[in-house]
Amino acid sequence: MARRPRTIGPSAADPGFSPQHALELVRSAIPPVHPAGRPFVGAGLALALAGRRHRWLRRAGLLAAGACAGFFRHPPRVPPTRPGAIVAPADGEICVIDVATPPAELSMGDVALPRVSIFLSLLDAHVQRAPVSGEVIDVQHRPGRFGSADLAAASTENERTSLRIRTPGGAEVVAVQVAGLLARRIICDAHVGDKLSIGDTYGLIRFGSRLDTYLPAGAQPLVTVGQRAIAGETVLAELP
């Protein structure tokens, strides 16, 4: 009779198995929560605790905590290593590929640049990541409306925060966080002078939004409208 092959790796009978290893497995399977989401998750858990004697209230609190943990998830990403890649700064669906003038508050002139826009639904991870490695040379916030982020007018009329990054080679890429119908809070943790590596997390938009990426002149988008983008991994274009 053939013997069952020995399981490779830690197990309950293996000296390598430990609570620490089990914890690492859980951490690898469940993405951590972005710090901006912890108060929301905590509020849901507090509601569940306060209503522990009432099933409906307890369930509502746990459901709210779980939903917020999912919305504010901060999954690990592995950026491409090939030089010159410009990656998606957000998860979501490519909704627009065109040419447009960068936000006026960045004072980059009236020259239209290639633009790739990503729409983030409520089910997407809402952290933003640096599209390239380089130095932050400008950050500008402009108040505005809170219209639906999937409309063409959202890029010009909605509240937004623009991040301008200059690569070591001198090329510039702009990522614009655009507020949406439910997104009433834009968080940008990057400041002028910061050095970012491609794929670094720099911000977050709460509850549905849009991300516009302005590419250097001459860059050709490598994605198509309707394609799903993964922040920090999907290559939008290459530096010219």
UniProtKB/Swiss-Prot annotation:
User: Which residues make up the annotated site Cleavage (non-hydrolytic)?
Assistant: G208, S209
The chemistry this enzyme catalyses reads: a 1,2-diacyl-sn-glycero-3-phospho-L-serine + H(+) = a 1,2-diacyl-sn-glycero-3-phosphoethanolamine + CO2
Q: How is it modified after translation?
A: Is synthesized initially as an inactive proenzyme. Formation of the active enzyme involves a self-maturation process in which the active site pyruvoyl group is generated from an internal serine residue via an autocatalytic post-translational modification. Two non-identical subunits are generated from the proenzyme in this reaction, and the pyruvate is formed at the N-terminus of the alpha chain, which is derived from the carboxyl end of the proenzyme.
Provide an example Pfam family for this protein: PS_Dcarbxylase
- What's the protein's topology in the membrane? Peripheral membrane protein
**From the Swiss-Prot or TrEMBL record, what is one GO molecular function term?**
phosphatidylserine decarboxylase activity
Please list the residues that make up the active site.
S209
Pyruvic acid (Ser): modified positions: S209
What pathway annotation does it carry? Phospholipid metabolism; phosphatidylethanolamine biosynthesis; phosphatidylethanolamine from CDP-diacylglycerol: step 2/2
Q: What Enzyme Commission number(s) apply to this enzyme?
A: 4.1.1.65
| Keywords for the protein's UniProt record, in alphabetical order | Cell membrane, Decarboxylase, Lipid biosynthesis, Lipid metabolism, Lyase, Membrane, Phospholipid biosynthesis, Phospholipid metabolism, Pyruvate, Zymogen
Instruction: Enumerate the subcellular locations listed in this protein's record, separating them with semicolons.
Output: Cell membrane
Cofactor binding mode and count: Binds 1 pyruvoyl group covalently per subunit.
Q: Which domain of life is it from?
A: Bacteria
Write down the required cofactor(s): pyruvate
Gene Ontology CC: plasma membrane
Biological process terms in GO annotation = phosphatidylethanolamine biosynthetic process
Q: How does it assemble?
A: Heterodimer of a large membrane-associated beta subunit and a small pyruvoyl-containing alpha subunit.
Entries under HAMAP family matching the protein: PS_decarb_PSD_A (MF_00664)
Question: Which family does the similarity line name?
Answer: Belongs to the phosphatidylserine decarboxylase family. PSD-A subfamily.
State the protein's purpose. Answer: Catalyzes the formation of phosphatidylethanolamine (PtdEtn) from phosphatidylserine (PtdSer).
Protein name, UniProt field:
Phosphatidylserine decarboxylase proenzyme
Tell me the name of the encoding gene: psd
